Design a protein with these regions (language model features):
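Ser/Thr-centric signal marking residues that sit
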Residues: 50, 123, 142
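Sec-exported extracytoplasmic/periplasmic mature domains
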Residues: 34-45, 74-78, 116-124, 175, ...
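Conserved beta-strand segments of alpha/beta enzyme cores
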Residues: 46-48, 126-129, 145
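Active-site-adjacent mobile loop/cap segments within catalytic or ligand-binding domains
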Residues: 4-6, 12-17, 71, 76, ...
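Active-site-adjacent substrate-binding region
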Residues: 106-132
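Catalytic-core regions of hydrolytic enzymes
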Residues: 2-4, 9-97, 101-110
Length: 185
């Protein structure tokens, strides 16, 4: 089973991530993706990271960065694509994890549900549910079931500190969600 883990965004522009509470999205999600890959590999899954190092820069624009991730996953023949991100809001009390899929009819929908259930169990953050988003490039251009997971809110001090200081909780939640979905947990 091949799992493509996309650590969302680039270390610098173009396509750098959100910033909040002294943290950068691209740094937080890289560390969580790296740790998730270790757990999944320990459970016998083949995992590829979109950014194998924190300095890896994909593309020269937002569009080419998204395309690089999708093309890599498609050409590798991934069975599932999971893009990890942090959320942001002007409402700093907004908290929790949520996920997006292209359609509820996809196998990505129950995968995303399992990931959110396990993230909630591991981190205690609210499960904000799975929503359909047809406008996200990484969901509509992948040839395999794909989900974009917003791990927590970088704009919320408690969420941001938890992601920065306890990345293993998020990695365990994502990995357990994948394993539960595959019937291996």
């Amino acid at each position: 089973m091949k799992i493509y883990l996309d650590a969302g965004h680039n270390p610098t522009n173009p396509n750098a991530g959100a910033e909040g509470n002294g943290y950068r999205e691209q740094d937080l999600v890289y560390e969580i993706a790296r740790r998730t890959a270790v757990i999944l590999r320990q459970n016998g899954l083949d995992v590829r990271l979109s950014r194998p190092t924190p300095e890896t820069q994909l593309g020269t624009s937002n569009a080419s960065s998204w395309a690089a991730r999708v093309n890599d996953a498609n050409s590798w023949g991934a069975d599932y694509f999971i893009s990890l991100h942090t959320n942001a809001s002007n409402i700093t009390s907004a908290s929790g994890s949520e996920a997006f899929v292209y359609t509820e009819a996809s196998r990505a929908y129950p995968l995303a549900q399992n990931i959110l259930t396990q993230l909630n169990a591991a981190t205690g953050l609210p499960n904000r549910g799975v929503s359909v988003r047809t406008n996200l490039y990484v969901l509509r251009r992948t040839r395999m079931p794909a989900t974009l997971v917003e791990l927590g809110f970088i704009s919320n001090p408690a969420d941001a500190d938890l992601m920065a200081n306890q990345p293993q909780l998020f990695a365990r939640g994502v990995a357990n969600g994948v394993l539960a979905y595959l019937g291996e947990l």
